Amino acid sequence: MHTLPLLFRHSLRTGAGFAKSTSPNHVSTTSFVVKLAPPRQRSRLGYVDASICLRCQFRAQTRFYSVQGDGGGSGKENKEGGSLEGGNPTSSTDAKRDQTSSPDSSSALKSSDKSQAEESKDGPESRKEDSEAETGGSLPSHWESRRSHLSKQFSQLMDNLQSNIFIANRHLNDLTGYSAIEALKKNIVAQEEHVRQTRTRVREAKDAYSAAINRRSASQREVNELLQRKHAWTPTDLERFTSLYRSDHANERAETEAQDALMAAEREAEEAAGLLSKSILSRYHEEQIWSDKIRRMSTWGTWGLMGVNVLLFLIFQVAVEPWRRKRLVKGFEEKVMEAIEKENGAQKEHAELEGKPAVEVTPPAVQTQRLTEELASEDQGENIPTFTSAAPSDLSSQEMQPGLPIQPEIEPEPEPEPEPEPIVEPPLTTILPPEASLSPDSWQQTFRDLFSERRVTLSQRDLTTVALESAAAGAAVMGVLIAIFRPR
């Protein structure tokens, strides 16, 4: 008898399905289809399909081998349907019943096998991607790619920044009118080149005219020489005289044409030079207008900045500084009140522990008010009698002990209260020193006092007045300077 794994190896074949025979006691059975996984998946799948009842598989395998060994049985292998028909009627009827439910189970097993195959195919790729994601963040190539990406972004940003700056500069030149001046500059450069060309043509025309004059003069001189020895002419001299006489008209016409060309070249050069000078003057005029416009804009911008500074100064001095001062005073008062409350609470706790009444600490504002009231009452000459009352703790102790004799109350001698020191406000001092004499020492001392570290106390009104006077003086000085140095 074969062992169980050997039976599995002999029985489980690719694409073969077997009908599971059951005992008569079972009501219904389900057929199963066992498919061998590909060689790549056998290591993963193992005996996944062998999880069906081993007893049923063992019975099917033994029946299969008994039929094959005897050779006379009526069972045969149905390769298309993937089932076996046995010789006994019970197995055939069970196989027929199982064929009705076999398509559903076989389709389910096929779908599960397909999903497992897809998972086995996708498994290495997903694991590879996961490993790359885990190790890719720390590899030098990853950092290099990120650095190159950042450098590309930075270079693109710089290129865009340069183009944006160029476009903004061009729009600013269009608004201020400097673009027209640039066009004038280019036109002047072209006109200068044209003037150079005209001057070159003038020189060439002069050379041609001089050559024509020399050629005609030479011919006339030769004619005169021939006329002087007219009585001794030879046939060659006669032919030469006739040729010179005929060419004299052509030389005269060439001289006239060279003279006309020279005059035209000189006229064109003069026109080009005049146009160039006009362009230079117009450029100078436009540049002066542009500089005046820029100077005017800078002046108004300076005035605007001065106005903004003065406005901010006034806002800070009128609104922000008082608010900040109030906030500081409020915070200081809150801290003082908290300290006083803590001190009163500590004194009350100490008095409760000792059985004595607590002495409350009055705030400084109440103390000053009481001192002023006492001073006013002393000035009026009113003597207000003072009565001292027994402490509540003493009264309660006497009431609780009725057997003890009640001692008469002894009024303590009033201690002389110290006279409150009058609150003297610091005198307001001016920013500028007092009027000094005209001596150099006094002026030197005054100048040093202006930059000394002497503390000055002044009111808000004086500070605002000084600020406004300074702003007005600066505006007046700037107006005078602009009126003096402004170009006419």
From Swiss-Prot:
Give the keywords, sorted: Coiled coil, Membrane, Mitochondrion, Mitochondrion inner membrane, Transit peptide, Transmembrane, Transmembrane helix
Residue span of region Disordered: 66-147, 343-423
**Main location per the UniProt record:** mitochondrion
Q: Where is the composition biased (Low complexity)?
A: 101-110
Bilayer-crossing residues are 300-320, 465-485
Acidic residues biased stretches: 410-422
GO cellular component: a single term: mitochondrial inner membrane
For whether the record's keyword set contains RNA-binding, the answer is no
What are the Polar residues biased-composition ranges? 383-400
Regions annotated as coiled coil: 179-212, 250-279
Q: Where is the composition biased (Basic and acidic residues)?
A: 111-130, 343-357
Mitochondrial intermembrane compartment segments: 321-464
Location of the protein in the cell: Mitochondrion inner membrane
Q: Which Pfam families match?
A: She9_MDM33
Would you say which domain of life the source belongs to?
A: Eukaryota
GO biological process annotations for this chain's record?
inner mitochondrial membrane organization
* UniProt membrane topology term: Multi-pass membrane protein
The stretches that face the Mitochondrial matrix side, renumbered to this chain, are 66-299, 486-488
Task: Please list the residues that make up the transit peptide in this record.
Answer: 1-65
How does it associate, per the subunit comment? Homooligomer.
PANTHER family assigned: SENSITIVE TO HIGH EXPRESSION PROTEIN 9, MITOCHONDRIAL
Q: Which family does it belong to?
A: Belongs to the SHE9 family.
Give a short account of what the protein does.
Required for the maintenance of the structure of the mitochondrial inner membrane. Involved in mitochondrial morphology. Causes growth arrest when highly overexpressed.
Q: What is this protein called?
A: Sensitive to high expression protein 9 homolog, mitochondrial
* UniProt source species: Coccidioides immitis (strain RS) (Valley fever fungus)
Report which gene this protein is encoded by. Answer: SHE9
